């Protein structure tokens, strides 16, 4: 049983904690918060020991009715693996602690590739991650791109990918971010960071990405165009999506053509937090003509990396020998079936 510490119990951390707790081969030994808030009370309700970075704030936690188990360093000492889910650019500052303690650690996509020297996706490079001390799980957008690009590459060969990311402005609980009434190019320059990030996992893929931010909180939307080496076949593309455990197919019969409807569907399915771990690829958008493949896919920014974190833990602790086995273990423990099989 692998002992896992969650350093940063926020949007991603709380989801990873619940996903880890659901597994049969790992357990949560603690989570960390910087201040008492609603998420800290959820951690208490879940039975996760609560640790804090600054022990001078212990009184504030205890006044709020939250028992403090110790410092973040205490938590890390007790763990086999540390999932760093602190905000972007904060995680890298925690690396010296993990190194000092000789612990395995994994970071999120908000950190640069260099923090770990290895960027991870369960479907693409699981075997290369086995036994590593440090791993970076790529961002939500990069995760979604890697999953589908890798499958298309295996089936038809990829000559070039052009992807446009229409990104949500903020997560639902982020009240200090926007925009409220604007479409913001982020960045104005081409490529956006997503293309080079894909290449940290799939270095042989030629890819150009562009990105913008829009006033919504639900999900990201990708418009993807792939030039293939072999002539592409629409039916075969649909089949490879259906056969992948982390790719969902939004069928015409569902009548869904927006991220809002997707999230409503996830709620009706009874998904915890209405989370969508899978790429949500719109079947009607799949266009194949000679060597050109186009489609839309929606990516739930709060959720798709959660299952990847669990698989990364298995890889670095050698609990599984390949990605297929780990993905099945993770999905089964979460009772997760891609949405293509629900309508």
UniProtKB/Swiss-Prot annotation:
Top-level class of the enzyme under EC nomenclature: oxidoreductase
Positions of NAD(+) binding: 11-12, 110, 168, 301
Compartments, record wording: Cytoplasm
Pfam families: DapB_N, Gp_dh_C
GO molecular function annotation: 4-hydroxy-tetrahydrodipicolinate reductase; glyceraldehyde-3-phosphate dehydrogenase (NAD+) (phosphorylating) activity; glyceraldehyde-3-phosphate dehydrogenase (NADP+) (phosphorylating) activity; NAD binding; NADP binding
Protein name, UniProt field: Glyceraldehyde-3-phosphate dehydrogenase
Stored InterPro entries: DapB_N, GlycerAld/Erythrose_P_DH, GlycerAld_3-P_DH_AS, GlycerAld_3-P_DH_cat, GlycerAld_3-P_DH_NAD(P)-bd, Glyceraldehyde-3-P_DH_2_arc, NAD(P)-bd_dom_sf
GO biological process, one term: lysine biosynthetic process via diaminopimelate
Catalytic activity, as annotated: D-glyceraldehyde 3-phosphate + phosphate + NADP(+) = (2R)-3-phospho-glyceroyl phosphate + NADPH + H(+); D-glyceraldehyde 3-phosphate + phosphate + NAD(+) = (2R)-3-phospho-glyceroyl phosphate + NADH + H(+)
EC number: 1.2.1.59
Gene that this polypeptide is encoded by: gap
This protein's pathway: Carbohydrate degradation; glycolysis; pyruvate from D-glyceraldehyde 3-phosphate: step 1/5
UniProt-listed SUPFAM superfamilies: Glyceraldehyde-3-phosphate dehydrogenase-like, C-terminal domain, NAD(P)-binding Rossmann-fold domains
């Amino acid at each position: 049983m692998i002992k896992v510490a969650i350093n940063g119990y926020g949007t991603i951390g709380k989801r990873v904690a619940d996903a880890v707790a659901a597994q049969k081969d790992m357990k949560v030994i603690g989570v960390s918060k910087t201040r008492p808030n609603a998420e800290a009370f959820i951690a208490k309700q879940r039975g996760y020991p609560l640790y804090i970075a600054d022990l001078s704030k212990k009184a504030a936690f205890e006044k709020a009715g939250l028992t403090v188990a110790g410092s973040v360093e205490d938590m890390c000492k007790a763990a086999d693996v540390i999932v760093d889910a602190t905000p972007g650019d904060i995680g890298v500052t925690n690396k010296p602690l993990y190194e000092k303690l000789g612990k395995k650690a994994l970071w999120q996509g908000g950190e640069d590739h260099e923090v770990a020297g290895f960027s991870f996706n369960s479907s693409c490079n699981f075997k290369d991650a086995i036994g590593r001390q440090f791993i970076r799980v790529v961002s939500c957008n990069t995760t979604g791109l890697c999953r589908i690009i890798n499958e298309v590459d295996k089936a038809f060969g990829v000559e070039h990918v052009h992807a446009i990311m229409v990104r949500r402005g903020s997560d639902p609980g982020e009240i200090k971010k926007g925009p409220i009434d604007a479409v913001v190019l982020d960045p104005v320059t081409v490529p956006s960071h997503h293309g080079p990030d894909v290449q940290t996992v799939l270095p042989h893929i030629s890819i150009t990405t562009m990105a913008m931010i829009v006033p919504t909180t639900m999900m990201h939307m990708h418009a993807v165009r792939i030039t293939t080496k072999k002539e592409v076949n629409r039916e075969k593309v649909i089949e490879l999506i259906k056969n992948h455990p982390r790719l969902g197919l939004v069928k015409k019969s569902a009548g869904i053509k927006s991220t809002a409807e997707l999230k409503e569907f996830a709620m009706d399915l009874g998904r915890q937090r209405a989370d969508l771990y899978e790429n949500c690829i719109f079947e009607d958008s799949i266009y194949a003509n000679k060597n050109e493949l186009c489609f839309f896919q929606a990516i739930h920014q709060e959720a798709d990396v959660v299952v990847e974190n669990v698989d990364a833990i298995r890889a670095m602790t050698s609990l599984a020998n390949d990605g297929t086995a780990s993905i099945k273990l993770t999905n089964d423990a979460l009772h997760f079936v891609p949405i293509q099989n629900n309508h």
